[in-house]
Regions:
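Short beta-strand/loop segment at the start of cytosolic alpha/beta domains
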Residues: 16, 22-37
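Conserved Nudix-box catalytic region and its N-terminal flanking loop in Nudix hydrolases
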Residues: 20, 58-60, 65-110, 148, ...
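Acidic, metal-coordinating catalytic segment for phosphate/diphosphate chemistry
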Residues: 30-65, 71
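Short beta-strand micro-motifs in enzyme catalytic cores
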Residues: 38-42, 53, 88, 139-141, ...
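Active-site-adjacent beta-strand/loop module that shapes the phosphate/pyrophosphate-binding cleft
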Residues: 43-48, 132-151, 165
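Acidic/glycine-rich phosphate/pyrophosphate-binding loops and surrounding catalytic core
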Residues: 119, 123-132
Length: 181
């Protein structure tokens, strides 16, 4: 298992020692609280005594990413428009860890099935990352799913318009080299 850029609280729990670099929160207030994210404005004091009056923290649920490979060696990508970027891109299957799911693995398997119609196969969690430890509170659980097979048609949410693309390794390399992922 690889842990990359995990937030300080996560590392401290693992080490079971006090974090001498932690910032002191002097005040905290919610600016926005939505089902998918919340924003806090905090006044913080750094260990060196400096104070930051407006530090924004984004609270998100944990996320999952899936590198999925079919039995015949094709990589499953999703092509979709992303309004935040105002661009259509190729992406790995990804989504939110749903509260009703018992684990990130169950969330990852559900996302792959819902968005692509693929499932089964062998699953391995290979990495846990913090997408942006400076401002985000969540972790992303990354999985490799091999030998997956088509089970059903995708079951998309109303906000999703996804084209499922099965790509060879050469096609994936081309997308990466041309910054299309």
């Amino acid at each position: 298992m690889i842990y990359i850029c995990s937030p300080n609280y996560f590392i401290c729990k693992e080490m079971k020692e006090k974090d001498d670099m932690a910032w002191k929160v002097l005040s905290s207030q919610y600016i926005s609280q939505e089902p998918w994210f919340s924003v806090r404005k905090e006044k913080v004091q750094l260990p060196n005594g400096n104070t930051i009056d407006s530090y924004y923290v984004l609270e998100y649920p944990n996320w999952v990413n899936v590198i999925a490979i079919t039995k015949d060696g094709k990589f499953i990508f999703e092509r979709q428009y992303r309004h935040g970027l105002r661009n259509t891109s190729y992406e790995l299957c990804a989504g939110v860890c749903e509260k009703e799911d018992s684990s990130p693995l169950i969330s990852a398997q559900s996302e792959l099935m819902e968005e692509t119609g693929y499932g089964k196969g062998e699953w391995e969690e290979f990495m846990i990352i913090s997408p942006n430890p400076g401002t985000h509170t969540n972790l992303t659980y990354c999985y490799l799913a091999t030998n997956v097979e088509k089970i059903s048609e995708p079951h998309l949410e109303v906000t999703e318009d996804i084209q499922v693309k099965l790509l060879t390794i050469e096609e994936v390399k081309d997308l990466l080299e041309n910054n299309k992922v």
